[in-house]
Amino acid sequence: MAGRFCQRDGGIMTAMVAVEILTECSQSSWNNSLHCGVFRHLPRNRPIIIGSSGEVFWVEYTLIAVAYIVQTHIMREYPSEFALALSHNVCVSISCAFVSLFVEENNPSAWIMRSKIMLICIVATGVVNSTSYVVESWTVRYKGAVFLAMFRPLSIVTAVVLGAIFLGDSLYLGSVIGGTLISIGFSVHNSLFHIANGFSALAKSSVLRHIGMLV
């Protein structure tokens, strides 16, 4: 059981890391593509999965996958979304405070909020992040980490589309197509996974029933 459990977690983590890496790498600019008929690629100095920048990507997305798995196990043992979100926010705040003290050691003015916009951004970020973490905790509690991971590319697609509509940002065709295809793939994988589990449970119950009849 332990070996099967570790294999399942390893597969989930690998799949989620692949989602993040593929979505990050499949960025090709779509600005003016309808007019010129060709896709304009991003500058060559964009970080890729090679060298120091690539190592940062791998570490970041691996830690995200591990965090989802740990979050799933915590929710199964202690099903309280708000308590988990509070603990998470306190730990993150303390960590950010220590990092900020180290980075801005010689710049005390960095701690001063110079406008109301900064305060509004801080409050909005706290509210949105806390709400999203509660929703994520609720999702992994009832659906598992795979279900949460398969919608992550769609969140990237949504952010890209809304940024292009309201902020005039570049729309990356790779993010739209790649995120959609990966999400469809995860949906199919999740459906097949549940079907396989159903057949496995049915076969197990059938075997136990036959054993009971023989006894």
Curated annotation (Swiss-Prot):
Subcellular location: Membrane
Annotated family: Belongs to the drug/metabolite transporter (DMT) superfamily. Plant drug/metabolite exporter (P-DME) (TC 2.A.7.4) family.
Protein name according to UniProt: WAT1-related protein At3g28060
Organism name: Arabidopsis thaliana (Mouse-ear cress)
GO cellular component, one term: membrane
Membrane topology per record: Multi-pass membrane protein
Coiled coil: none
InterPro entries reported for this sequence: EamA_dom, WAT1-related
Pfam family, one: EamA
Keyword Nucleus among UniProt keywords: no
Keywords of the record: Membrane, Transmembrane, Transmembrane helix
